Design a protein with these regions (language model features):
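Conserved N-terminal entry element of GNAT/NAT acetyltransferase domains
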Residues: 1-15, 19, 23, 28-35, ...
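Conserved GNAT acetyl-CoA-binding A-motif
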Residues: 129-131, 159-172
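Active-site rim helix/loop that mediates acceptor-substrate recognition in acyltransferases
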Residues: 39-67, 71-72
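A short, internal acetyl-CoA/4′-phosphopantetheine-binding micro-motif in the GNAT/acyltransferase core
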Residues: 71, 103-105, 136-143, 174
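C-terminal "cap" of GNAT-fold acetyltransferases
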Residues: 165-181, 185-187, 193, 197-219
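Conserved acyl-donor/pantetheine-binding loop and adjacent beta-alpha core of acyl/acetyltransferases
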Residues: 86-130
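Conserved acetyl-CoA-binding loop-helix of GNAT-fold acetyltransferases
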Residues: 135, 144-158, 182-186
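Conserved beta-strand in the GNAT
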Residues: 69, 75-83, 132, 137
C-alpha cells in the first residue's frame, strides 16, 4: 500500500499504545476491565498502563517491544501487539501479572483476587512456543482499507524470523465481536474452540461471557 510504513513501536508511541490497549480491552463496549476488575477510573488506568509500558518487560501485551505501528502518509493509523509465548522461559500471563502486582495499588490487586474465581471461567491458556496475537487496533478513519491484513501479516512474518520452527498463531476474541472474528478469518484464522461462562456476574466485569479461540497455521 502506497504511503504505508509498518515499524517497531518506541517510547514515543506510548500515548497511542495506551489508547490501543484501552480500546482493545473495551472490545467495542463500554465495559473496561481496569475499572470493573481493579476499580480504577479510565484516567487512572491509562497512567498505570503507561507506567507498566515504561518498565520495558518483553513478550507480553504490556510490552512496547510487542507492538508494531502502522503509519499511513505520516499519520499513525493502527497497531498490533504480538509475541512468541514463553520465548524467554516465562509465560506472558506471569509477566503481565508481575507488572500488575508491581504497578497497581495493593487495594486494586486485592479486589482482582476476590473476582478471580469468576474470571477463571473464561480463561484460555496460551500455547507455549506459538505466536500470540494479543490485540489489533485501527483508528476509525483507517478502517475498511485492508490495513488489518497487512499489519497482522507483517507482524507474524517478523516473529516467524525470530523462531523459524513456529507453526501456529493464536488469537482470542470475545465471541460477540463479530467484526473482529470476520477480520481474523479474512487473514487466515479459523475458529477452533469457544469458552462460555454461565456466571452472569461476568457480564459486569468483561465485554461478554464467551471467548473464541482462533488459529492460523503457518507453513
Amino acid at each position: 500500500m502506497k504511503g504505508l510504513i509498518i515499524r517497531d513501536a518506541n517510547i514515543n508511541d506510548i500515548p497511542f499504545i495506551v489508547e490501543t490497549i484501552v480500546e482493545a480491552e473495551k472490545s467495542g463496549t463500554n465495559i473496561f476491565s481496569y475499572n470493573t476488575i481493579f476499580g480504577l477510573s479510565e484516567e487512572e488506568a491509562k497512567k498505570n498502563i503507561e507506567n507498566m509500558l515504561l518498565e520495558e518487560v518483553d513478550d507480553c501485551e504490556l510490552s512496547i517491544s510487542s507492538f508494531k505501528i502502522a503509519v499511513l502518509n505520516n499519520i499513525i493509523a493502527g497497531a498490533t501487539a504480538a509475541w512468541i509465548e514463553g520465548f524467554q522461559g516465562l509465560s506472558s500471563a506471569m509477566l503481565k501479572g508481575n507488572l500488575l502486582n508491581f504497578t497497581l495499588p495493593k487495594a486494586c490487586i486485592e479486589r482482582a483476587k476476590l473476582l478471580s474465581p469468576i474470571l477463571k471461567g473464561l480463561h484460555i491458556e496460551h500455547t507455549n512456543n506459538s505466536i500470540q496475537l494479543g490485540l489489533v487496533y485501527l483508528k476509525k478513519d483507517f478502517r475498511g482499507m485492508g490495513l488489518v491484513n497487512l499489519l497482522i501479516d507483517s507482524h507474524i512474518d517478523f516473529l516467524k524470523q525470530k523462531k523459524m520452527e513456529i507453526t501456529e498463531v493464536y488469537v482470542q476474541v470475545f465471541s460477540n465481536n463479530l467484526a473482529a472474528v470476520k477480520a481474523y478469518k479474512k487473514v487466515g484464522f479459523s475458529v477452533i474452540m469457544s469458552k462460555k461462562s454461565s456466571n452472569k456476574t461476568i457480564l459486569n466485569l468483561l465485554p461478554f461471557n464467551e471467548k473464541t479461540l482462533m488459529l492460523r497455521e503457518l507453513k
